[in-house]
Protein backbone atom coordinates (compact mmCIF):
# COMPACT_ATOMS: atom_id res chain seq x y z
CA UNK A 1 0.00 0.00 0.00
CA UNK A 2 1.41 3.47 -0.91
CA UNK A 3 2.70 5.52 1.99
CA UNK A 4 1.35 8.96 2.85
CA UNK A 5 2.74 11.55 0.45
CA UNK A 6 2.93 15.18 1.58
CA UNK A 7 2.84 17.83 -1.14
CA UNK A 8 2.03 21.52 -1.32
CA UNK A 9 -1.06 22.60 -3.24
CA UNK A 10 0.98 25.58 -4.36
CA UNK A 11 3.38 23.38 -6.33
CA UNK A 12 2.00 22.27 -9.70
CA UNK A 13 5.12 20.21 -10.42
CA UNK A 14 4.89 18.29 -7.13
CA UNK A 15 1.19 17.59 -7.69
CA UNK A 16 1.80 16.29 -11.20
CA UNK A 17 4.61 14.13 -9.84
CA UNK A 18 2.14 12.40 -7.50
CA UNK A 19 -0.33 11.75 -10.32
CA UNK A 20 2.41 10.42 -12.57
CA UNK A 21 3.68 8.10 -9.86
CA UNK A 22 0.41 6.70 -8.49
CA UNK A 23 -2.00 7.20 -11.40
CA UNK A 24 -5.08 7.49 -9.13
CA UNK A 25 -8.48 6.48 -10.44
CA UNK A 26 -10.13 9.10 -8.24
CA UNK A 27 -9.30 12.20 -6.20
CA UNK A 28 -11.07 13.26 -3.00
CA UNK A 29 -9.93 16.83 -2.37
CA UNK A 30 -10.53 17.78 1.29
CA UNK A 31 -7.43 19.90 1.96
CA UNK A 32 -7.91 23.50 3.07
CA UNK A 33 -6.16 26.06 5.28
CA UNK A 34 -7.87 27.25 8.45
CA UNK A 35 -10.72 29.71 7.94
CA UNK A 36 -8.67 32.15 10.01
CA UNK A 37 -5.68 32.06 7.67
CA UNK A 38 -4.55 35.02 5.58
CA UNK A 39 -6.35 36.09 2.41
CA UNK A 40 -3.27 35.27 0.35
CA UNK A 41 -3.00 31.74 1.76
CA UNK A 42 -6.72 31.01 1.44
CA UNK A 43 -6.95 32.11 -2.18
CA UNK A 44 -3.68 30.41 -3.09
CA UNK A 45 -4.47 27.05 -1.50
CA UNK A 46 -8.23 26.84 -1.97
CA UNK A 47 -8.56 28.39 -5.42
CA UNK A 48 -5.19 28.05 -7.15
CA UNK A 49 -4.50 24.73 -5.41
CA UNK A 50 -7.83 23.29 -6.55
CA UNK A 51 -7.14 24.52 -10.07
CA UNK A 52 -3.76 22.75 -10.00
CA UNK A 53 -5.30 19.49 -8.77
CA UNK A 54 -8.01 19.63 -11.43
CA UNK A 55 -5.44 20.20 -14.15
CA UNK A 56 -3.31 17.29 -12.94
CA UNK A 57 -6.39 15.05 -12.74
CA UNK A 58 -7.55 16.11 -16.19
CA UNK A 59 -4.21 15.30 -17.81
CA UNK A 60 -3.85 11.94 -16.06
CA UNK A 61 -5.61 9.38 -18.26
CA UNK A 62 -6.16 7.05 -15.29
CA UNK A 63 -8.05 9.63 -13.22
CA UNK A 64 -11.79 9.56 -13.90
CA UNK A 65 -13.40 11.03 -10.77
CA UNK A 66 -12.85 14.14 -8.64
CA UNK A 67 -14.75 14.88 -5.41
CA UNK A 68 -14.33 18.25 -3.71
CA UNK A 69 -15.24 19.16 -0.13
CA UNK A 70 -17.04 22.49 0.13
CA UNK A 71 -18.36 24.32 3.18
CA UNK A 72 -21.61 25.63 4.62
CA UNK A 73 -19.93 29.04 4.68
CA UNK A 74 -19.72 29.13 0.87
CA UNK A 75 -23.47 29.70 0.57
CA UNK A 76 -25.65 32.41 2.04
CA UNK A 77 -27.17 31.62 5.44
CA UNK A 78 -30.66 30.16 5.59
CA UNK A 79 -33.02 29.23 8.40
CA UNK A 80 -35.47 27.19 6.31
CA UNK A 81 -34.71 23.79 4.73
CA UNK A 82 -32.93 24.74 1.51
CA UNK A 83 -32.11 22.56 -1.49
CA UNK A 84 -28.96 22.72 -3.57
CA UNK A 85 -30.93 24.28 -6.43
CA UNK A 86 -32.34 27.08 -4.27
CA UNK A 87 -29.19 27.92 -2.31
CA UNK A 88 -27.62 31.32 -2.97
CA UNK A 89 -23.89 30.92 -3.55
CA UNK A 90 -21.08 33.41 -3.30
CA UNK A 91 -19.08 34.11 -6.46
CA UNK A 92 -17.14 36.88 -8.20
CA UNK A 93 -20.33 38.86 -8.77
CA UNK A 94 -21.36 39.08 -5.12
CA UNK A 95 -17.93 38.74 -3.51
CA UNK A 96 -18.48 41.80 -1.25
CA UNK A 97 -21.39 39.92 0.36
CA UNK A 98 -19.23 36.96 1.37
CA UNK A 99 -18.71 36.98 5.15
CA UNK A 100 -14.98 36.28 4.86
CA UNK A 101 -12.22 35.21 2.48
CA UNK A 102 -12.54 31.56 3.48
CA UNK A 103 -16.18 31.50 2.36
CA UNK A 104 -15.35 33.16 -0.95
CA UNK A 105 -12.33 30.95 -1.63
CA UNK A 106 -14.34 27.76 -1.06
CA UNK A 107 -17.16 29.09 -3.26
CA UNK A 108 -14.79 29.92 -6.10
CA UNK A 109 -13.08 26.53 -5.81
CA UNK A 110 -16.46 24.80 -5.98
CA UNK A 111 -17.27 26.63 -9.22
CA UNK A 112 -13.98 25.42 -10.72
CA UNK A 113 -14.77 21.82 -9.80
CA UNK A 114 -18.29 21.86 -11.23
CA UNK A 115 -17.10 23.59 -14.42
CA UNK A 116 -14.42 20.91 -14.90
CA UNK A 117 -16.98 18.10 -15.17
CA UNK A 118 -16.59 16.28 -18.49
CA UNK A 119 -16.65 12.83 -20.05
CA UNK A 120 -12.92 12.59 -19.33
CA UNK A 121 -13.16 13.67 -15.68
CA UNK A 122 -16.41 13.46 -13.75
CA UNK A 123 -16.54 15.88 -10.84
CA UNK A 124 -18.81 16.41 -7.85
CA UNK A 125 -18.98 18.50 -4.67
CA UNK A 126 -19.88 17.41 -1.15
CA UNK A 127 -20.92 20.41 0.94
CA UNK A 128 -20.55 19.92 4.69
CA UNK A 129 -21.21 21.90 7.90
CA UNK A 130 -19.23 21.67 11.16
CA UNK A 131 -17.88 18.16 11.74
CA UNK A 132 -17.56 16.31 15.03
CA UNK A 133 -16.34 12.83 15.95
CA UNK A 134 -13.26 10.83 16.86
CA UNK A 135 -9.88 12.35 16.00
CA UNK A 136 -11.31 15.89 15.95
CA UNK A 137 -8.52 18.16 17.19
CA UNK A 138 -10.38 21.44 16.75
CA UNK A 139 -14.08 21.93 17.54
CA UNK A 140 -14.71 19.33 20.25
CA UNK A 141 -11.39 19.93 22.08
CA UNK A 142 -12.32 23.63 22.26
CA UNK A 143 -15.54 22.65 24.03
CA UNK A 144 -13.61 20.40 26.41
CA UNK A 145 -11.31 23.32 27.18
CA UNK A 146 -14.30 25.56 27.93
CA UNK A 147 -15.60 22.94 30.38
CA UNK A 148 -12.29 22.72 32.19
CA UNK A 149 -12.06 26.49 32.39
CA UNK A 150 -15.64 26.68 33.77
CA UNK A 151 -16.83 28.69 30.75
CA UNK A 152 -19.32 26.17 29.39
CA UNK A 153 -22.35 27.80 31.06
CA UNK A 154 -21.96 30.94 28.95
CA UNK A 155 -23.41 31.54 25.51
CA UNK A 156 -23.00 34.39 23.05
CA UNK A 157 -26.19 35.80 21.56
CA UNK A 158 -29.72 34.48 21.89
CA UNK A 159 -29.03 31.07 20.30
CA UNK A 160 -32.02 31.35 17.94
CA UNK A 161 -30.14 30.67 14.68
CA UNK A 162 -30.01 26.99 13.72
CA UNK A 163 -26.92 25.25 12.34
CA UNK A 164 -26.28 21.89 10.73
CA UNK A 165 -23.73 19.43 12.15
CA UNK A 166 -22.16 16.29 10.70
CA UNK A 167 -20.72 13.16 12.27
CA UNK A 168 -17.29 12.53 10.76
CA UNK A 169 -18.00 8.91 9.77
CA UNK A 170 -20.96 10.10 7.72
CA UNK A 171 -18.82 12.78 6.10
CA UNK A 172 -16.35 10.13 4.95
CA UNK A 173 -19.17 7.86 3.81
CA UNK A 174 -20.73 10.58 1.65
CA UNK A 175 -17.43 11.32 -0.10
CA UNK A 176 -16.94 7.63 -0.88
CA UNK A 177 -20.51 7.36 -2.16
CA UNK A 178 -19.91 10.27 -4.53
CA UNK A 179 -16.59 8.83 -5.70
CA UNK A 180 -18.10 5.40 -6.43
CA UNK A 181 -21.03 6.98 -8.25
CA UNK A 182 -18.67 9.01 -10.44
CA UNK A 183 -16.69 5.89 -11.34
CA UNK A 184 -19.82 3.89 -12.17
CA UNK A 185 -20.93 4.31 -15.83
CA UNK A 186 -24.56 3.80 -14.83
CA UNK A 187 -24.63 6.64 -12.26
CA UNK A 188 -21.87 9.09 -13.19
CA UNK A 189 -24.11 11.27 -15.38
CA UNK A 190 -26.46 11.81 -12.43
CA UNK A 191 -23.66 12.77 -10.06
CA UNK A 192 -21.18 14.50 -12.36
CA UNK A 193 -21.37 18.29 -12.20
CA UNK A 194 -23.56 18.21 -9.10
CA UNK A 195 -23.16 19.32 -5.50
CA UNK A 196 -24.78 17.68 -2.49
CA UNK A 197 -25.71 18.89 0.99
CA UNK A 198 -24.55 16.42 3.66
CA UNK A 199 -25.36 16.70 7.37
CA UNK A 200 -26.93 14.86 10.29
CA UNK A 201 -30.25 16.33 9.20
CA UNK A 202 -30.90 17.78 12.66
CA UNK A 203 -30.55 21.59 12.55
CA UNK A 204 -30.36 23.12 16.02
CA UNK A 205 -28.98 26.06 17.94
CA UNK A 206 -25.20 26.04 18.18
CA UNK A 207 -25.19 26.28 21.96
CA UNK A 208 -27.90 23.62 22.22
CA UNK A 209 -25.54 21.27 20.40
CA UNK A 210 -22.63 22.35 22.59
CA UNK A 211 -24.63 21.62 25.72
CA UNK A 212 -25.36 18.12 24.41
CA UNK A 213 -21.59 17.69 24.10
CA UNK A 214 -21.10 18.94 27.66
CA UNK A 215 -23.74 16.56 28.99
CA UNK A 216 -22.14 13.60 27.22
CA UNK A 217 -18.83 14.60 28.81
CA UNK A 218 -20.40 14.56 32.27
CA UNK A 219 -20.97 18.31 32.67
CA UNK A 220 -24.65 18.99 31.95
CA UNK A 221 -25.90 22.57 31.98
CA UNK A 222 -29.43 23.37 33.13
CA UNK A 223 -31.30 26.18 31.29
CA UNK A 224 -31.35 28.37 34.40
CA UNK A 225 -27.54 28.11 34.66
CA UNK A 226 -26.92 29.69 31.24
CA UNK A 227 -25.44 33.19 31.16
CA UNK A 228 -25.98 35.02 27.86
CA UNK A 229 -23.63 37.70 26.55
CA UNK A 230 -25.04 39.94 23.77
CA UNK A 231 -23.53 39.13 20.39
CA UNK A 232 -22.92 42.82 19.64
CA UNK A 233 -20.77 43.11 22.77
CA UNK A 234 -18.57 40.20 21.71
CA UNK A 235 -18.32 41.49 18.14
CA UNK A 236 -17.11 44.84 19.42
CA UNK A 237 -14.63 43.19 21.78
CA UNK A 238 -13.29 41.00 18.97
CA UNK A 239 -12.86 43.94 16.60
CA UNK A 240 -11.09 45.92 19.31
CA UNK A 241 -8.73 43.05 20.09
CA UNK A 242 -7.86 42.62 16.42
CA UNK A 243 -7.12 46.34 16.11
CA UNK A 244 -4.92 46.33 19.22
CA UNK A 245 -2.99 43.29 18.02
CA UNK A 246 -2.52 44.87 14.60
CA UNK A 247 -1.17 48.10 16.10
CA UNK A 248 1.31 46.38 18.42
CA UNK A 249 2.38 43.42 16.24
CA UNK A 250 1.77 44.81 12.73
CA UNK A 251 -0.48 41.86 12.02
CA UNK A 252 2.13 39.22 12.79
CA UNK A 253 0.12 37.86 15.75
CA UNK A 254 -3.64 37.28 15.87
CA UNK A 255 -5.78 37.27 19.04
CA UNK A 256 -7.67 34.14 20.04
CA UNK A 257 -10.92 36.12 19.98
CA UNK A 258 -11.66 36.89 16.30
CA UNK A 259 -14.46 38.90 14.72
CA UNK A 260 -14.95 36.22 12.07
CA UNK A 261 -15.87 33.70 14.79
CA UNK A 262 -18.37 36.06 16.40
CA UNK A 263 -19.99 36.94 13.06
CA UNK A 264 -20.44 33.24 12.32
CA UNK A 265 -22.84 32.97 15.26
CA UNK A 266 -25.26 35.23 13.38
CA UNK A 267 -25.39 33.08 10.23
CA UNK A 268 -26.61 29.49 10.53
CA UNK A 269 -27.79 26.96 7.96
CA UNK A 270 -30.68 24.60 7.42
CA UNK A 271 -30.57 22.09 4.56
CA UNK A 272 -32.73 19.59 2.73
CA UNK A 273 -30.97 16.24 2.26
CA UNK A 274 -33.43 14.98 -0.36
CA UNK A 275 -30.99 15.19 -3.26
CA UNK A 276 -28.22 13.28 -1.45
CA UNK A 277 -30.72 10.65 -0.35
CA UNK A 278 -32.23 10.25 -3.81
CA UNK A 279 -29.06 10.21 -5.91
CA UNK A 280 -26.26 9.04 -3.60
CA UNK A 281 -28.34 6.88 -1.28
CA UNK A 282 -27.06 8.89 1.69
CA UNK A 283 -28.74 8.49 5.07
CA UNK A 284 -27.77 10.59 8.12
CA UNK A 285 -27.08 9.18 11.56
CA UNK A 286 -30.18 7.66 13.13
CA UNK A 287 -29.21 8.38 16.74
CA UNK A 288 -27.21 11.58 17.13
CA UNK A 289 -27.07 11.19 20.91
CA UNK A 290 -25.32 7.84 20.53
CA UNK A 291 -22.59 9.16 18.21
CA UNK A 292 -22.12 12.20 20.45
CA UNK A 293 -21.57 9.85 23.40
CA UNK A 294 -19.13 7.82 21.32
CA UNK A 295 -17.31 10.99 20.34
CA UNK A 296 -16.99 12.23 23.90
CA UNK A 297 -15.91 8.85 25.23
CA UNK A 298 -12.91 9.00 22.89
CA UNK A 299 -12.30 12.74 23.41
CA UNK A 300 -12.23 12.65 27.22
CA UNK A 301 -9.72 9.80 27.12
CA UNK A 302 -7.55 11.62 24.60
CA UNK A 303 -7.51 15.27 25.70
UniProtKB/Swiss-Prot annotation:
Keywords, sorted A to Z: Endoplasmic reticulum, Lipid biosynthesis, Lipid metabolism, Membrane, NAD, NADP, Oxidoreductase, Steroid biosynthesis
Gene3D superfamilies, alphabetized: NAD(P)-binding Rossmann-like Domain
Stored Pfam families: 3Beta_HSD (PF01073)
Highest taxon in the source lineage: Eukaryota
Stretch list, region Disordered: 77-96
One example of a Gene Ontology biological process annotation: sterol biosynthetic process
Coiled coil: none
Function of the molecule: Sterol-4-alpha-carboxylate 3-dehydrogenase; part of the third module of ergosterol biosynthesis pathway that includes the late steps of the pathway. The third module or late pathway involves the ergosterol synthesis itself through consecutive reactions that mainly occur in the endoplasmic reticulum (ER) membrane.
Family indicated by similarity: Belongs to the 3-beta-HSD family.
The protein, known as: Sterol-4-alpha-carboxylate 3-dehydrogenase ERG26, decarboxylating
Originating organism: Gibberella zeae (strain ATCC MYA-4620 / CBS 123657 / FGSC 9075 / NRRL 31084 / PH-1) (Wheat head blight fungus)
Amino acid sequence: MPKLQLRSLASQDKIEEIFERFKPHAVIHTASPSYMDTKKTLMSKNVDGTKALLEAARTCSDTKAFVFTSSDEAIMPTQEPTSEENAHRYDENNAPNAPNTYALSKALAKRLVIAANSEELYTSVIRIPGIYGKYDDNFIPQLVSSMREKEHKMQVGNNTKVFEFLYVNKAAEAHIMAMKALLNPSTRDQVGGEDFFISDGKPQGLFDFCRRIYAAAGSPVRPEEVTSIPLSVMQTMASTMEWVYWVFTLGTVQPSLRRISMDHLDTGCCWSLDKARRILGYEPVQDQDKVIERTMDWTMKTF
